[in-house]
Amino acid sequence: MHVNSNNETRILWNGPNNWIVVSKNKEILINIKKKCDDKNFAVTDLSHSRTVIELKGNSVKEILKKGCPINFSEFKLNNCANSVFHGITITIDMISDSPETFRIFALRSFGESLYHSVTDACLEDGYRGI
């Protein structure tokens, strides 16, 4: 799936008529609601419902392959996908290719389990929590 982005906002296509907007701009939700007709659009703030883990480095795709069935050799910058990591439903977004950087979104209630699964997958290559 494709991602559209600029310097402050990323829009991830998440399925038919469904997008995830990721931004540090706190006003974006207000701006979107002003421009969208309430009769034809629903905008929901998911800020507090998701956990985000960002992975960066040369081995990121190899690490993700350990828990996710996606063909990462075809995954490119500004691609996103819905999948699973060790049984946890996730959305993956490739935000940079130099160095390779991915954001993984999961429901907040699965955040700790996802963190442990990802760090276990990183043990061979090492990791640094920030």
Where are each of the predicted segments found?
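Basic, glycine/lysine-rich polyanion-binding surfaces/domains
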Residues: 1-130
